[in-house]
Design a protein with these regions (language model features):
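Conserved active-site and cofactor/substrate-binding residues in soluble primary-metabolism enzymes
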Residues: 1, 5, 21-25, 61, ...
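Acidic/His-rich, divalent-metal-binding segments that scaffold phosphate/diphosphate chemistry
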Residues: 1-57
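Predominant activation on well-ordered alpha-helical scaffold segments within soluble catalytic domains
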Residues: 7, 11, 24-27, 31, ...
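C-terminal binding/interaction regions
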Residues: 14, 127-129, 134-179
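Amphipathic, non-membrane alpha-helical segments in soluble helical-bundle scaffolds
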Residues: 16, 97-100, 160
Length: 179
């Protein structure tokens, strides 16, 4: 599957600006991690892009629709990573891709939320300030902090370095992401 084909799937199911920005930000972070780990960065980017593609149109079935669609077109590895990121299914984390999606999804969204409450947005945002916000349970309360912790542990990265990596990717793409 090409990125353009993946974007067509995303845009057929997702219309809201917030979810589209989340998809784009996770796409970019996953692409960067794919390069960092010497993996197929296009596949990693597509996984990040599509991980919540069916959430807006089919919230009660998420991620069943997108997983089934991906399996039908032979994208089993991406489908498995998306299945695993939905922790309620209890799917095992078999590959680095599976672990990276879990590690990047919630924390990328959380980092964007941190930007939205700062006058200077992403500029000057530090891992220390993101970690401080993580401790405030009332801030971005829907973010699953235990999933962030589990993802970081599974991926085998340091939380501070992981946050710094995400900030760097978001900062490099701030115009595209409007942050």
């Amino acid at each position: 599957m090409t990125r353009d084909e993946a974007r067509n799937i995303l845009e057929s199911m997702t219309k809201g600006d917030s979810l589209l920005r989340h998809a784009r930000s996770v796409e970019l972070v996953m692409e960067a991690y794919g390069k960092h780990f010497g993996e197929d960065s296009e596949e990693w980017a597509i996984t990040g892009m599509l991980h919540d593609a069916d959430y807006e149109a089919y919230p009660e079935e998420h991620p069943n629709r997108i997983v089934n669609m991906l399996r039908e077109i032979g994208e089993e590895k991406i489908a498995h990573a998306i299945s695993a990121h939905y922790t309620k299914w209890g799917v095992e984390y078999e590959t680095k891709l599976d672990k990276a999606l879990l590690a990047c999804d919630e924390l990328t969204g959380f980092t964007i939320a941190c930007c939205q409450v700062r006058p200077e947005s992403i500029e000057g945002l530090t891992a220390k300030s993101v970690k401080k916000k993580l401790k405030q349970k009332s801030f971005a309360a829907k973010v699953e902090r235990d999933e962030i912790e589990k993802g970081v542990e599974l991926l085998g990265v340091d939380l501070t370095e992981h946050i710094e990596f995400i900030i760097k990717v978001l900062e490099e793409n701030r115009k595209d992401l409007n942050i």
